[in-house]
Amino acid sequence: MTLGLYRGFDYLTLRRWVKNVHGEDALRAIADKLAPLGYAGAVTDVILPDDWRPLAEYLEFNRAIDQVCGGEDAMMKLGRFSCDDQIKFYHRVAMRLMRPGWLLENSMALWRKYCDVGRWEVRWPRPHAATAYLYEMPLTEPTYCVAMMGFFERFLQLCGCRDVRLVHSECVARGGEVCKWEGTWR
């Protein structure tokens, strides 16, 4: 099984968030943390949105951001920023007109544009609740999963959902079979 590749677009989003919120010094500190692993290029290389880079590098980039920028709260904020950064204004207008369930199901179909491993499934235990499962992900990192939770939270808010509550109830990085996020909203 391949360890996977991740799209350059997301690397650029991570860099943008660190630079905007924490500054150039934080980017340099992250590059310094990644250098012994051979991944400083996540910060220093010219990366194009359509480039494919190692998933392991992307996950280590997330871990270094967590260490330099302040833990779980920072990763939730990064996830929310990623959603805002990647979903353009005209998409947001359309999102308000469609059902959150339909949008969530169809957005999961876009996964392969960002990562070449893993597979999403969404289940609906009741109308204002969903459980998202990420299967067949050879590597993951708890900080990445927290950022994903921030992304999901903001995504649902952009769909018009209120009082969004999410729990990452199972994680491959914590020994689980899958990564599982459970959410409710009004």
Question: What are the functions of these language-model segments?
Answer:
Residues V146-G160:
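Short, non-transmembrane amphipathic alpha-helical segments
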Residues G4-F9, V18, R126, Y133-E136, ...:
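Non-catalytic regulatory/interaction regions at protein termini and inter-domain linkers
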Residues I47-A147, R162, E170:
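Amphipathic interaction/junction segments at domain boundaries or subunit interfaces
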